[in-house]
C-alpha cells in the first residue's frame, strides 16, 4: 500500500461499470481523506508533485470495454488482446498530447513528468511497461484492460475519464492502427513524441488542436481555455522566493 514517497500511499478504488460513478468515487475518496487528515491536524494533498525530489502523485485509470452481453471486447483469448484493444490504444495515443491539459491541469502538474520516476513523458504504449503512457497489464486475458498512466492526482476525474473514453472511441470508430508496443524503458527512446512538458505548451496544444473539437462540446473547450489562461497569467505575475535568492543581490 505504501508507495515510493515519504507519507505516500497507493489507493485502488473498486472497478465499476459506470464511468460517472468512478469519477464520483474518486472525488468522494479525496474529500474523505482530506477530512480525516484535518481531524488529526494533518494535511493530505493530491498535488501532482508536492516535493521536488520525491515521487509525484499519479491518477492511473484502468478501463475495460464490455459489449451488451457483458463480454470484454478487449479479450480475444490471446496475450496481445483484440484488434479493438489496439484501435483503442491508437486513439489514446493520437489524442494524448492534445488532451494533456486535462491530464495535467496545473503548473505543478508538469513537475511530475520527470524521467526515471515512472511518470510518462512521451506518447507510448506497451505490455506490462510501467514507463509507458499506456500500459496493458498482464494476467488473465478475461481481465484484459488498458491502464492510462498520464494523469496526476490533481486532475479532475470527470475530465480525465471523459478524455480517456473519447480517445478510445476515436480510435475504435476510425479503426486507427497502434504503432509497435515499446518493451524497453521509454525514457531511452529518443524517437518517441514527447508530451507537452510545461503548462503553457499544454494550453496552446489544447487550444490549437484539430481533434479536441470532435471530442468535447465547444462551450467546455472555450471555458477551460479561458480559465487556464487566466490561471497561468496569475502565476506568471508572481515572483518566487527562489528568484529572490538567486537574483536579488547577484545581478
Language-model features and meaning:
Residues 19-182, 187-192:
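Active-site capping/gating regions of soluble enzymes
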Residues 14-18, 211:
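A broad detector of the eukaryotic-type serine/threonine protein kinase catalytic domain
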Residues 2-3, 15, 60-62:
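Histidine-centered active-site/metal-ligand motif
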Residues 186-251:
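Acidic, glycine-enriched catalytic cores built around paired aspartates
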Residues 6-7, 53-54, 222-223:
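Short secondary-structure capping/turn micro-motifs that flank functional sites
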Residues 3-11:
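Short, conserved phosphate-binding/catalytic loop or strand-edge motifs used
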Residues 1-4, 103-108, 216-222:
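Short coil/turn segments at secondary-structure boundaries
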Amino acid at each position: 500500500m505504501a508507495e515510493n514517497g515519504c507519507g505516500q500511499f497507493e489507493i485502488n478504488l473498486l472497478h465499476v461499470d459506470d464511468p460517472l460513478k468512478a469519477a464520483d468515487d474518486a472525488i468522494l475518496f479525496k474529500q474523505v481523506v482530506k477530512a480525516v487528515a484535518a481531524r488529526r491536524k494533518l494535511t493530505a494533498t493530491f498535488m501532482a508533485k508536492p516535493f521536488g525530489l520525491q515521487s509525484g502523485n499519479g491518477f492511473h485509470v484502468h478501463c475495460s470495454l464490455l459489449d451488451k452481453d457483458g463480454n470484454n471486447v478487449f479479450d480475444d483469448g490471446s496475450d496481445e488482446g483484440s484488434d479493438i484493444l489496439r484501435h483503442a490504444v491508437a486513439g489514446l495515443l493520437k489524442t494524448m498530447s492534445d488532451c494533456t491539459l486535462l491530464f495535467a491541469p496545473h503548473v505543478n502538474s508538469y513537475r511530475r513528468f520527470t524521467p526515471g520516476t515512472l511518470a510518462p513523458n512521451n506518447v507510448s504504449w506497451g505490455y506490462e511497461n510501467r514507463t509507458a503512457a499506456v500500459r496493458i497489464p498482464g494476467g488473465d486475458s478475461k481481465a484484459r484492460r488498458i491502464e492510462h498512466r498520464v494523469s496526476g492526482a490533481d486532475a479532475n476525474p470527470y475530465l480525465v475519464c471523459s478524455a480517456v473514453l473519447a480517445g478510445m472511441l476515436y480510435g475504435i470508430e476510425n479503426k486507427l492502427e497502434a504503432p509497435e508496443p515499446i518493451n524497453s524503458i521509454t525514457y531511452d527512446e529518443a524517437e518517441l513524441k514527447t508530451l507537452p512538458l510545461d503548462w503553457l505548451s499544454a494550453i496552446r496544444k489544447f487550444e490549437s488542436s484539430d481533434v479536441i473539437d470532435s471530442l468535447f462540446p465547444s462551450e467546455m473547450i472555450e471555458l477551460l481555455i479561458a480559465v487556464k489562461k487566466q490561471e497561468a497569467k496569475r502565476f506568471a505575475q508572481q515572483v518566487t522566493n527562489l528568484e529572490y535568492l538567486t537574483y536579488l543581490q547577484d545581478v
